[in-house]
């Protein structure tokens, strides 16, 4: 007879998080674990909520995925871990104020991801997206949307401020890879979703009959990552090859920017637009964080509502020109001989990510396998552009990374390098501004 006791986790020892997700405005993030979930304030970092479910012989407490609804008391949960609280094919909306389940949805396969808004609830399975109304009795708004197997998707709620006499317009954008054509992206405006009055008859139709989409030919390889900016004007994509990042207009699908991460293949596992959409942060399995400059950042010049304006990268008076890096031979080699590689645009700054708990840049193999989630720090103080857009330069310069397995929170800042002094007396074009990413602080969670 085996009388050995089960190995118990040592007191004070912590396991990694099953998932880390930021809320819709990136002011908070939730972490799912074997006991339940935690909620932190992004910046300044502080623990806001700890929820530990009670385990029984019949039922565990593990949560595999959690997603907040802004800073409300509602949070979407999916079971996970060694002893899941809920089945892996079930989505539960937890009301932390009432300390009970508000409602739940059950599916035929494992739930990969859930996103929320005050109006919609989107659930991702292996190759399908389900769009429901966010209500105590949720209604399926259209037939399931077929996507590429395990394909990424992004969902963004955009508020467009009207004139003094007009009400603000709220729209919801959904971007997902095509199930039929490799590298093709669909962008849908859920405000154009046709009303489904007859569930039994209408569900026999395809999702295209309910939801028109903008089709973008993004890559030749399968799409690995998709992100929509906060203004809903741009969508960034990366393929499984991981060498190029492309940014398209959500209005007409035209290519606005193309950036090069590197020459070798890499898995780009997270991307994030800055609050104003002037920069894009990208992290890959090379454990390198890149920041790309999309548009000049100067008071009174940026209009996120017109992404086509971002194609201009020249310098105009006090406006800082594009600060991304380019090849030194770009303007030397004749166009007729020049390979496309020489026209590539690299990041404005990058940093190799290392475990902050280790000194002397020791290579940590476990940390190299870890994955982080990116967000940008937002602050209350800001001033306003002449065109009415709120602007805070600090919001475009500060990033937060949260690591799943290591349970580490890091804050990075983008700093301008000092320009070298020129004493030769020769006047010429101003050198390209150089930037660097510096870790400002970190904490264990």
Curated annotation (Swiss-Prot):
Disulfide bond sites: none
Keyword Transport assigned: yes
Pfam family, one: PROPPIN
InterPro entries, A to Z: PROPPIN, WD40/YVTN_repeat-like_dom_sf, WD40_repeat_dom_sf, WD40_rpt
SMART domains listed in its UniProt record: WD40
Protein keywords: Cytoplasmic vesicle, Membrane, Protein transport, Repeat, Transport, Vacuole, WD repeat
Cellular localisation: Vacuole membrane; Cytoplasmic vesicle membrane
Molecular function in Gene Ontology: phosphatidylinositol-3,5-bisphosphate binding; phosphatidylinositol-3-phosphate binding; phosphatidylinositol-4-phosphate binding; phosphatidylinositol-5-phosphate binding
Renumbered ranges of WD repeats: 218-258, 263-302
GO biological process: piecemeal microautophagy of the nucleus; protein transport
Entry keyword annotation includes Hydrolase: no
One GO CC term on file: endosome
Location of the region described as Disordered in the Swiss-Prot/TrEMBL record: 301-321
UniProt biased composition (Polar residues): 312-321
Membrane topology recorded in Swiss-Prot or TrEMBL: Peripheral membrane protein
Family the UniProt entry places it in: Belongs to the WD repeat PROPPIN family.
Function summary: Involved in mitochondrial or peroxisomal functions and amino acid signaling pathways.
Domain commentary: May contain a beta-propeller domain involved in specific binding to phosphatidylinositol 3,5-bisphosphate (PIP2), leading to the association of the protein to the membrane.
Name of the protein this chain belongs to: SVP1-like protein 2
Taxonomic classification: Eukaryota, Fungi, Dikarya, Ascomycota, Saccharomycotina
């Amino acid at each position: 007879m085996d009388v050995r006791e089960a190995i118990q986790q040592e007191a004070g020892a912590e396991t990694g998080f099953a998932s880390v997700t930021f809320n819709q405005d990136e002011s908070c993030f939730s972490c799912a674990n074997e006991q339940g979930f935690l909620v932190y304030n992004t910046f300044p970092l502080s623990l806001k909520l700890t929820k530990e479910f009670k385990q029984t012989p019949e039922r565990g407490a593990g949560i595999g995925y959690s997603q907040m609804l802004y800073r409300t008391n509602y949070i979407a949960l999916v079971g996970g871990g060694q002893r899941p609280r809920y089945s892996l094919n079930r989505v539960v909306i937890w009301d932390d104020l009432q300390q009970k389940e508000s409602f739940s949805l059950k599916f035929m396969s494992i739930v990969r991801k859930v996103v929320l808004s005050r109006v919609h609830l989107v659930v991702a399975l292996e190759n399908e997206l389900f769009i429901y109304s966010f209500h105590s009795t949720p209604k399926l708004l259209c037939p399931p949307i077929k996507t590429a197997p395990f394909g990424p998707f992004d969902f963004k709620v955009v508020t467009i401020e009207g004139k003094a006499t007009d009400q603000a317009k709220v729209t919801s954008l959904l971007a997902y890879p095509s199930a039929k054509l490799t590298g093709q992206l669909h962008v849908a405006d859920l405000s154009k979703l046709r009303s489904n009055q007859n569930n039994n008859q209408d569900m026999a139709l395809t999702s295209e009959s309910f939801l028109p989409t903008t089709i973008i030919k993004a890559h030749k390889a399968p799409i690995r990552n998709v992100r929509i900016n906060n203004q809903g004007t741009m969508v960034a994509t990366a393929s499984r090859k991981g060498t190029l990042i492309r940014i398209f207009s959500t209005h007409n699908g035209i290519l606005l920017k193309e950036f090069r991460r590197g020459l070798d293949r890499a898995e780009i596992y997270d991307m994030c637009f800055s609050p104003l959409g002037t920069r894009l942060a990208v992290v890959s399995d090379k454990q390198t964080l890149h920041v790309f400059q999309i548009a000049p950042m100067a008071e009174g010049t940026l209009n996120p509502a017109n992404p086509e304006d971002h194609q201009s990268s020249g310098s105009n008076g006090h406006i800082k020109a594009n600060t991304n890096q380019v090849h030194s031979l770009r303007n030397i080699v004749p166009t007729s001989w020049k390979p496309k590689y020489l026209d590539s645009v690299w990041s404005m700054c990058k940093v190799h990510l290392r475990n902050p708990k280790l000194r002397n840049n020791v290579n940590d193999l476990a940390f190299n396998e870890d994955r982080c989630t990116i967000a940008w720090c937002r602050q209350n103080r800001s001033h306003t552009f002449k065109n009415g857009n709120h602007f805070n330069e600090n919001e475009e310069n500060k990033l937060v990374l949260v690591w799943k397995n290591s349970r580490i929170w890091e804050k990075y800042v983008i700093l301008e390098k000092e320009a070298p002094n020129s004493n030769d007396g020769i006047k010429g074009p101003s050198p390209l501004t150089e930037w660097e990413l510096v870790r400002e602080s970190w904490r264990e969670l």
